Amino acid sequence: MAVVRGGSYDSTSHGANTPGLVTPEQINHLISNLNLLDQIGNFEHYNMNRIRLVWSRMWSVLSDFFVSVGLSENLSVAIFVMDSLRQLAMKFLEREELANYNFQNEFLRPFVIVMQKSNSTEIRELIVRCISQMVLSRVNNVKSGWKSVFMVFTAAAADERKNIVLLAFETMEKIVREYFPYITETETTTFTDCVRCLITFTNSRFNSDVSLNAIAFLRFCAVKLAEGGLVCYEMTGDNVSSNTPDAPLSTPVPTDKDDYASYWVPLLAGLSKLTSDPRSPIRKSSLEVLFNILKDHGHLFSRQFWVGVINTIVFPIFSSLHDKKEMDEDENDEYSEGTTWDSDTCTVAADCLVDLFISFFNVIRSQLPGVVSILTGYIRSPIQGPASTGVAALMRLAGDLGNRLTEDEWREIFLALKQAATLTVPGFMKVLRTMDDVNVLGIAQSYYDVDVASDQGLSADGLDDDDLQMASYIVSRMKSHIAMQLLIIQVITDLYKSHTQPFSEANISIILDIFSSVATHSQKLNSNTVLHKKLQKACSILEISDPPLVHFENESYRSYLNFLQNMLADSPSLTNATLVESELVVVCEQILHIYLKCTGAPSEKKEPNQPVLHWILPLGSAKKEEVAARTSLVVSALEVIRGFERDLFKRCVQRLFPLLVDLVRSEHSSGEVQLVLSSILQSCIGPIIMQ
């Protein structure tokens, strides 16, 4: 083949653009003669000085040839043609690329295609070495060629050979550390390609150090972006963006030359995706780096961009946590695994979210409902660790924001807590109903029969392995459910105590609904005596502790009682004080009913199928223990009644007096009840009788 050294456009079109040049038959012929391959290299070399468009037309044909030969099964020929291409590329990169052209990218494209398609380890390693040599020796002239460089390294990052991955990352490390300004001086997509390449390295299964270093380089990229002034604004209004994250921001409008989203979004989105990586160190590192980037450079973001980041980058991180809560709760095995995150990752994520929201509250306060929903999702977790994390995070969020929250924002918090308390109940009750099909010998289905047999021993007969497994799961679920419900009312109590200003009556109403629903739910659980006996027998056989049902009922009513009492004391100007007082009377009345039922005192309302009792039997040991456990609560209720104002006591004495009389006739485990009861009769009932 003749070497073309000059001539017009037409003189090249006949030789270089002839379709037959790259037919399979001619390629096979060229492969058999390395001299012809060398001649093609010379042909391209001597035509580099032609008009760029002319050269581009020639190269569109020759590049296909290099790809075809580079993918040849003949390793020697493939190596030869890749080395020839390297020499041509080194020569080509000596020339400065014209503005707004992408000739370099076109020239290097054969490396990309062969790297992606070649089955030869030797060829892929050679390409990585060739690209590394070219970019490090000609970095000043690389412009559009960066795209091909990063595409080659991206393919190398996903390679099945460890040495290729490490070799490519070594060059990437040098590029990012020493030549970062060259990456962003041409076009936005170049930086995006660099970020995607680093993210691919984070997924490397060969070396965790490579993954962690790649994540660190992503943070380095963010620092360089911020330092380089790539984000600037034309502000609207009088306010100017402050360097302090918490300063109020007017809405910045990006200028035409400031396409900042195309720089930040791929970087942030890549880190967000890494938070679901199966490797714990990678998850934690990506979480910390992502939120550190947002905290350190968030002051550069407009309000509109922040909203997009929160909804598309931050919130999806926690989707696995929510998905786990929303799964069907009768799937026993699902709950044994917990969330896809371990406890440490859950804690890191919650802390980072709260820190970020507090730092930029004035900018992203509209996203409060989403943040609260995530934290209450933690609280709803059937696992103790995430639930405790959610409580701590929500308390810190409310504590640090303090009086900056509006009543509507407090309403969002309380509604989310109410939802967390109520939405889990139907699924939990569905789980409990599975015990209805478990028949246990020695346990009757009648309330009265169960009650009088409470002190009889329970044998292991009547429960097979499947029944025991089911009971074990239900006990575990019940313990987690009780802990979650108590956590919610504890959070509300702590929020109320820490809030210096009175809540609105609308928010007080929501709080009362939560206390009422939890207390009612606890009483309903405690009233199912047959279920208790089944679980008690199973726990005895399995040698595990019983679910703390009495404790649940005591604490829920105690918290409800204390909240009502504190609210009346702290808010004397409350317009609906009468309604709160009425609710307080109802709660006290309910506590007395529960205690009297436990002591076996006769009541006007009898259980179905319960025979008439002509005398009261002494309490058995089990009932005595329960009465002792309930004593402190009933004493608290009696002390509240004793503290009623005279007018309030007169209004409710008709409802309370029969209960007080029943208390006189009941058997108690402590003298405290009689002592407070005597005080009520003397200081409250006596004056009314003496009138």
Feature names for model-found ranges:
Residues 1-691:
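Intrinsic disorder/low-complexity flexible regions in very large eukaryotic scaffold/regulatory proteins
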